[in-house]
Amino acid sequence: MGQKINPIGLRLGINRTWDSRWYAGKNEYGRLLHEDVRIRELLHKELKQAAVARIVIERPHKKCRVTIHSARPGVVIGKKGADIDKLRKRVADITSSDVVINIVEIRKPELDATLVAESIAQQLERRVAFRRAMKRAVQSAMRLGAEGIRINCSGRLGGAEIARMEWYREGRVPLHTLRADVDYGVATAFTTFGTCGVKVWIFKGEILEHDPMAQDKRLAGDDNRPRRDAA
């Protein structure tokens, strides 16, 4: 079933963490969940040109900490921080907590599956040939160190009468291996012929127990799992 399930959801608690990290009482869970949805909708709408890949929401005591992962942090911050102050005020209108917004720069957007999918979708909307867009994205990812990448495009590709799916893959993408660091992204292209869906899987390598780089990606309190001895 690793072929069917969302690769990120399958690995939650193993080598990925949740995008919403907070605990709530019985009577507050629904309200906070709706706040998270509205905050994400607002930020994605306001930051369309900022290449936002991920929005993490944490709620320490009486605060709401929003971390925006963007490939173009200058667009988010604005001139002298004016834009981020406006965003903070608009987010504060949604939640009753004190809002803190942090920006994290994505230094290699070619290795982020969400940004790659959105880039291909934008090219399809500009009527770039889908095979050219897919091949360019694959070459860029492999050049920057990805161990494997797969891209699916489906819909009325090139304005064809009959919808179909085309895919391109290079390297290996082990969807069943839980220790594999597989990033997954989805985007939709709104063309004059209808909508086209874009899915991207990027394999960045395996995260092993003895790998010090894996410490940042593991959840706190997850040290009791059996360790794999180095060969």
Curated annotation (Swiss-Prot):
Q: Which residues form the KH type-2 domain?
A: 39-107
Note one Pfam family from the annotation.
KH_2
A Gene Ontology biological process in which this protein takes part is:
translation
GO CC entries: cytosolic small ribosomal subunit
Q: Name one GO molecular function term.
A: mRNA binding
Q: Does the keyword RNA-binding apply?
A: yes
Quaternary structure per UniProt?
Answer: Part of the 30S ribosomal subunit. Forms a tight complex with proteins S10 and S14.
Q: Which family does it belong to?
A: Belongs to the universal ribosomal protein uS3 family.
Q: Which PANTHER family match?
A: 30S/40S RIBOSOMAL PROTEIN S3 (PTHR11760), SMALL RIBOSOMAL SUBUNIT PROTEIN US3C (PTHR11760:SF19)
- What protein am I looking at? Small ribosomal subunit protein uS3
- What does UniProt list as this organism's lineage? Bacteria, Pseudomonadati, Pseudomonadota, Alphaproteobacteria, Hyphomicrobiales
Q: Which gene encodes it?
A: rpsC
